[in-house]
């Protein structure tokens, strides 16, 4: 991760040859941006990157530049070592569509990792998609049919994170500090559509919503001190909600 917000978005550099200031674009001007251990970046860096994610543009000096399409950000953070980190505010975390938890590799996978590192094997990575193909795929995903009953199911799930007592989940009321925002509903719908697309269906079914619910919601639910004291996780809360909310 860059040490300065100017390193991320870019800055104005003085050219002695031309005696003018020229724009030097930062690494954010890419189709795919990897922000490694984002919670170790200072707040100003996080803010610069997340603003770029939201606005799809950055301002350098007096000029505003559109970011390339598609623009995707993958951020990582180490959940174990938290010393010297800068936790992302809830409003910024909410801008990430998904939070995917990566566990230890499986036995065969770890053997492959050892083999590649010991032998010095280089991965032969070949592109399988072009940028314009991803853009076209996104258009198709947005055409996947989302029935009103599925819409209500999505909204009910998100509302249950805010008002669990209204969904016969009174035991969660004191466990949830805050629930999902409207972005949670939007991204749950988009992720369900994407999952249906991957499954080669032109319509969303409840199983699509359930399949992506944990990844969409786990970082959007704030736990109370009582929940943390009880060792309850946001994943467990999502599971309880999915088991309780009526499936269409």
Regions found by a protein language model. Name each.
Residues 1-3:
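Short, small-residue-biased leader/transition segments that mark boundaries at the very start
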Residues 5-32:
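Short glycine-rich substrate-engagement loop in P-loop NTPases that contacts/grips substrate
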Residues 8, 36, 49, 76, ...:
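Conserved RecA-like P-loop NTPase ATPase core
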Residues 21-31, 60-77, 88-97:
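AAA+/SF3 P-loop NTPase mechanochemical coupling elements
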Residues 27-54, 68, 83-92, 104-112:
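Conserved AAA+/SF3 P-loop NTPase catalytic/coupling segment centered on the Walker-B
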Residues 37, 71, 75-80, 102-105, ...:
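A short beta-strand-to-loop transition that corresponds to the Sensor-1 phosphate-sensing loop
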Residues 99-171, 198-202, 206, 227-229, ...:
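Conserved C-terminal "switch" segment of AAA+ ATPases
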Residues 164-248:
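C-terminal engagement/docking regions of AAA+ P-loop ATPases
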């Amino acid at each position: 991760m860059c040490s300065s917000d100017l390193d991320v978005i870019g800055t104005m550099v003085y050219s002695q040859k031309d005696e003018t200031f020229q724009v030097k674009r930062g690494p954010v001007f890419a189709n795919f941006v990897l922000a490694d251990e984002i919670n170790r970046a200072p707040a100003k860096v996080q803010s610069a990157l997340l603003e770029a994610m939201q606005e799809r543009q950055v301002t350098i000096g007096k000029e505003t530049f559109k970011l390339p399409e598609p623009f995707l950000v993958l951020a990582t953070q180490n959940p174990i070592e938290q010393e010297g980190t800068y936790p992302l505010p809830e409003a910024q975390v909410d801008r990430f569509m998904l939070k995917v938890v990566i566990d230890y590799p499986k036995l065969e996978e770890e053997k492959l990792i050892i083999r590649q590192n010991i032998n010095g094997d280089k991965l032969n990575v070949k592109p399988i998609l072009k940028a314009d193909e991803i853009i076209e795929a996104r258009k198709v995903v947005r055409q996947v049919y989302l029935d009103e009953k599925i819409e209500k199911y999505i909204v009910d799930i998100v509302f249950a994170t805010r008002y669990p007592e209204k969904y016969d989940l009174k035991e969660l009321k004191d466990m949830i500090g805050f629930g999902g925002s409207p972005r949670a509903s939007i991204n749950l719908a988009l992720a369900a559509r994407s999952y249906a697309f991957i499954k080669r269906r032109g319509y969303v079914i409840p199983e699509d919503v359930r399949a992506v619910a944990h990844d969409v919601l786990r970082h959007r639910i704030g736990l109370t001190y009582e929940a943390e004291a009880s060792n309850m996780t946001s994943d467990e809360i999502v599971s309880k909600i999915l088991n309780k909310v009526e499936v269409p």
